[in-house]
């Protein structure tokens, strides 16, 4: 079974990816892991990627696509299937993935799209606060401190609402064309992410069991 998982930051994609890999015994192919392995093994694409990373530059699409192709060419993929997580990030990468799968005689069986309302995600992701003296982490809504005084707490730049909103907006702008692309192929299965973690996985499990 060859799968792709998608979802906005904070939607629980990483948690559900781990559950899918564990339950269905497919290879978990995440962008970070692929890059680390390719660089450690000094593959052709890994060496190229490292040259950009060492200069503090973004790795070009053709190198990222090449690293994905190297990983999908490995023997375990035909035996176990895979779950792609964190790739493709752009519609151009999605088209490159289509071409790679065709060249390797592979095909996607399904795209799991974890849907959560962006406003809920904004509240979830921008609520983290840190106590100035102890460094303890709390959440304004889900785990508020008993003795909250605003001056005793601070937020990291990454957690500020305007920063989180920008990140969500970028992810929506990049992700929606990819979802539309796979929806036209009849591959997308929408899963409601605004529920208990185990309920989300039950919904995914039901979809994937029917795909097998």
Swiss-Prot record:
Tagged with keyword ATP-binding: yes
PANTHER family: NUCLEOTIDE KINASE (PTHR23359)
Places the protein is found: Cytoplasm
InterPro entries: Adenyl_kin_sub, Adenylat/UMP-CMP_kin, Adenylat_kinase_CS, P-loop_NTPase
Organism: Streptococcus sanguinis (strain SK36)
An example Gene Ontology molecular-function term: adenylate kinase activity
Protein family according to the UniProt entry: Belongs to the adenylate kinase family.
Superkingdom as given in the UniProt entry: Bacteria
Gene, per the UniProt record: adk
Pathway the protein takes part in: Purine metabolism; AMP biosynthesis via salvage pathway; AMP from ADP: step 1/1
Signal peptide range in chain numbering: none
Stated name of the protein: Adenylate kinase
Chemical reaction(s) catalysed: AMP + ATP = 2 ADP
Entries under NCBIfam families matching the protein: adk, PRK00279.1-2, PRK00279.1-3, PRK00279.1-4, PRK14527.1
Quaternary organization: Monomer.
GO biological process terms held by the UniProt record: AMP salvage
Main localization, broad class: cytoplasm
Pfam families: ADK
SUPFAM superfamilies: P-loop containing nucleoside triphosphate hydrolases
GO cellular component, one term: cytoplasm
Stretches for region LID: 127-159
